[in-house]
Structure formats: C-alpha cells, structure tokens
Amino acid sequence: MNALTRDLVNLVNTAEENQTAKEQTSGTQFREKLHLMPPVGWLNDPNGLCQMDGVFHAFFQYSPFNAEGGVKMWGHYTSTNLIDWEYKGVSLYPDQPFDCHGVYSGSAFLEDGTMYLYYTGNVKLEDGDFDYINTGREANTVLVTTKDGIHFGSKKELLRNSDYPSDLTCHVRDPKVWKKDDTYYMIQGARTKNDVGQALIFESSDKINWHFRSRIESEKPFGYMWECPDYFETDGIKILSSSVQGLEGKEWADRNVYQSGYFLVDGDILDSYKLSPYHLWDYGFDYYAPQSFEAEDGRRIHISWMGMPDCEEYTNPTIKDGWQHCFTFPREVFIKDGKVCQKPVRELDAKKQQLQNVQNELTQSGCPVYEVNVDGIKENHFQAVLSDELILDYENGRFQMHFTTKSKTSVSAGRSLRYAEVGTLENVKILADTSSVEVFVNDGEFVFSTRYYPNDYKIVVHSPSAHITFDKIQ
C-alpha cells in the first residue's frame, strides 16, 4: 500500500464512520431496503457484476466525499441472494498515475477461480488549454485480479490512448470482456472526432495483451458517445446494450438527457452483422449505465444505476442527508415471444407476505416496501396512484408514469412525465421501495423506473375485472 492509498483509506473510513454516526443520531428518511445505495456520498454505474463460488459481487462507482459526485473509486457489496447485501468497503482506489483522476467503469471476467477486473483509468491533464474531449484526457484500460473478491493484486495498465484508432477522441471507456472459443474479446464505448458514437472490439489470447480488431457502428450516426457497452446472448438472441449520449430530434425530446437501450444483432458481431433499431431498456426517469452478467444457474442478471447524469430537471433530496442514488433492483432478462423482457429476480419471492388478493380495486396504506401485481386487465382499464402524487395509467395504447406536482420540493423532486406506446395492456407489476418505484408492463416488455420521496405510503389501484395482489416485502 502506497502513501496515497493509505491516506485515501483513512479518509474514506472517516467519511463512512461520520455518516453512520449521523444516521444513528438523526436517522435518514429515504434509505432503501431492496436497492443498493452508497454508505455515504455518491453512487453511479454498477461495475464488475458477477457471481463467484455462490457469492454475488456488485462493485459501484463511488464518490464518498461528496453527495453530488467527485473522484471515483470502486465500492463493493456482496450477497448470496441478490437482496441482502453486505458492504465490503472500497476495493479499488485512484492511487496510480494511470488512474489518478478516477477508477472509472468496467467489468468482471471469471476464469479458473480468478476474477479479472477490467476498468478505465481516468487521467485529466492540467496546466494546458484542453477541451478534455480531443485533448487533455487519458483513458487507460487497466486490469486487476483477485481470487476471493476481497484481496486484490497489483494493477496492470493494458491499453493507452495510443493503442486506440487515431480517429477517436479521448473518450474510450468501460471495458466488458467475454470469451468465445479460445479467444478473449473486449468491447469498449467510443466517440469519434466527428462526434459519432460507436463501440470497439479488441481481442487477446491471454487476457493481458490486447489488439484492436473492429468497430461496431449503426448504419447512420446515432449519438456522439456509446457508453457502458455490453454484449451477450440469451435464449438464442444476440443483444448489444449501450448507453447513448447525444440523441436529438422529436423521438427523444420527451426522454431523458441520455438513453440506455439495446440493439438486436443479426449475424456475427465479430464479423458481418446488422443492428436492429434501438430499444430502450427503461422508459422511466432514473435509469442509466446498465450492466449484466450470467449467474451460475444460467440466468442473465441485469442491474442499472437508478439515476441520470447531467440532469438539471430533477434532483434527490437525500443530498442533504449526505448520500445520493441507488441501483435498480436486480432483473432477469429473458425472451418471450421473440421480445426482450425483464422481471425482478425470483429470489424476491422468498421475501413476500401477501396482504391482499382482490378484484377490481385495491387500497393499501402504511407499507413502504411492496409488490403489486395486476393481471387479467380487461379493455385496457388501469390506474394506480402512489402516495397521492405518482400516477400510473393507460390510455389509447400509451402507458404513462407521471407526477401531479413537478416542484423539486414535492414527492417528484422535479420529475414530470414519461411514457411508452405499449399496445394492448395485459398486466402490470409494481415494485416499490422507500424512495423508488419500478414498474413492469406486459411481462416486463416495457419497464419504468423512478425515484420518489413521499412522506406517507399509500397505493390505490383501479382496474375493473382485473386480479390484484399486494405483497409486503419483509
């Protein structure tokens, strides 16, 4: 441990201890039960998601010194059931010349009992006239390994700016690694000097020495940056996920600042391929930078940052409590009738206690953490009102999530309206936590996620002839 690492360890420990003492004394109103949060400060992208020897690992972008962001390091949680998580502290600090301005996002690759963590080491040069897009930034690809997810070896710098194609800006980041046959592949997000987003493929025979292989591009320019790329196959469907910055036009005018979605891949992504139109993973307010991994039982598990970068429209009142943001609840990605769908991981079933099983209408108060299922919806009639201010409803093929008040001091904290054209409405699942709501429409073909900040907890559901259940989450 070098002197910088030692000092960072002490500073982080002090910040976390002070936050714990503060919350023990005064409490915190909106801490979640099901969703991972930072102990103190700021959380953003999920990193290094994996399951090794029965234990799930979730690393996260962590800025413990400021609830509105700052220098990034990797915090670390573990779990055996994807619900009850144990905080393991900071695993990776920005303590080397090649990552001194942030241990940025990356992924985990497992092989032969070893966890290989690949990430982007961020360096911002000083004392120069830099725009930090084309000049002044280093985006270094770094590797660190561990046998147990707790004790880590030395960092290795694998790729520098000079190893990337010359027509790119300094924005190359977020490595994700997989293996096919005897070759290892790495995908990274990139921005060209012409402000076109794309993904890069690198290949290696040993997980250490990497060489540029090819690009992944849409037929027409699509945004200026593809962040947090992820490639996987599930049920025979090939999926390229990316968080895209810079989408403009009428189609995106009512959406978030940046989008997170996926392309279906026809062909071989390493050779000849065609990308489908872009589909959003989530149509709500708070969703960005998703990553996935394959669990030991073969399920594809998907987790996202339940937040939105560079958003001035809305905020989170937990900032005054010394922390901000959380992850989405882990989701299973599956294919139904050729469509990509999502649902909460099945481990949640063991935590449910059914309180109501009714027809037509449901009212429940005083329970902040719950799941509501509405099945057998007839003639598309559906409305749910949460804490009097968050409304979910359907009309003429459009499903909406909207708040009655947009004020930053209200339940919405500034959020207004999000929607999707869903066609016929068949069923709705609502998963609510202390300060978040995730809504799964038509078996999870469409999903809406939002933070919300009620003083009292109540839900009223109206759907004539539908079957409605309310389960308290223990």
What are these regions (language model features)?
Residues 16-22, 258-474:
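Beta-rich accessory regions
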